[in-house]
A protein has these predicted regions:
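Structural motif
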Residues: 33, 58-59, 86
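Positively charged, polar, low-complexity stretches
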Residues: 28, 34-35, 45-46, 101-108, ...
Length: 192
C-alpha cells in the first residue's frame, strides 16, 4: 500500500530536495546511489564545494534497526553524513548518531529544522571509495584498456594512490553521473 506524508520516505525525500533547492546553493543532487563493497543504496547524494554528502531518509514508518550500520558505511565513503527524519524518530536518532552526523527534522507542519550540523569524515576507506566508482570509469581516467584488468585488479592499481586522489575520482564520477540529470530536472521543474 502506498504511503503518504511523513510516513513516506519518498515524500520526505521530495521535501528535503525542495529544502536544498530553496537555499539556492551551487549543488548537484543525485537519487539512490549504489556505493561500496556491499553495493548498498544511499537515499540521496549531494555534491557541493567539491564535497560529497550522503543523505539517509527515515520516515515515521521506517525502523532504525540498520541505521548504525548505514552510518558506519557512509562514513567510509562520503565527506558528510546527514539524516533527515521526523519528530517520531528524533530522540532515537540523536542517541544512535554520533556528533559528527548532521540531523534534520521534518516537523508535523512539513517545515524542516536543522538540528545539528555535520562534521567532515576523516577516516575514509580507499577500497570502499573505489568500489563506489564504476570500473569502466576507472579504466577511462587511468588510461587502461577495458578488459585488460578485471574490476578487482583495476581497483587494486588505484588503491596504491593517495586517498585524496581517490576522493577526487569519486567526486568527479558522481558529478559526471548526476550533473546532466540534475540540470534537466531543474530545467523541467522551473527552478532557477
Amino acid at each position: 500500500m502506498k504511503q503518504y506524508g511523513l510516513n513516506s520516505a519518498e515524500y520526505i525525500k521530495c521535501l528535503f530536495i525542495d529544502y536544498l533547492l530553496y537555499k539556492k546553493e551551487n549543488q548537484i543532487i543525485g537519487n539512490e546511489f549504489m556505493y561500496g563493497l556491499k553495493r548498498k543504496l544511499v537515499d540521496l547524494v549531494v555534491l557541493k564545494k567539491n564535497r560529497t554528502f550522503a543523505v539517509e531518509i527515515k520516515s515515521s514508518n521506517d525502523n532504525l534497526i540498520r541505521l548504525e550500520e548505514q552510518i558506519r558505511e557512509y562514513k567510509k565513503i562520503f565527506d558528510y553524513v546527514l539524516i533527515v527524519t521526523t519528530e517520531k524518530h528524533k530522540n532515537n536518532i540523536i542517541e544512535k548518531a554520533s556528533d559528527d552526523i548532521g540531523i534534520y527534522i521534518v516537523q508535523d507542519d512539513l517545515s524542516i529544522i536543522k538540528f545539528r550540523n555535520p562534521s567532515i569524515q576523516k577516516n575514509k576507506d580507499k577500497i570502499e571509495l573505489l568500489y563506489s566508482v564504476n570500473a569502466r570509469y576507472l579504466c577511462k581516467i587511468g588510461n587502461y584498456t577495458y578488459g585488460k584488468y578485471n574490476a578487482d585488479e583495476l581497483r587494486s592499481l588505484f588503491a596504491k594512490k593517495r586517498i585524496s586522489y581517490i576522493q577526487e575520482i569519486l567526486f568527479t564520477y558522481l558529478y559526471e553521473k548526476y550533473n546532466k540529470k540534475f540540470n534537466l530536472f531543474i530545467s523541467e521543474r522551473g527552478v532557477n
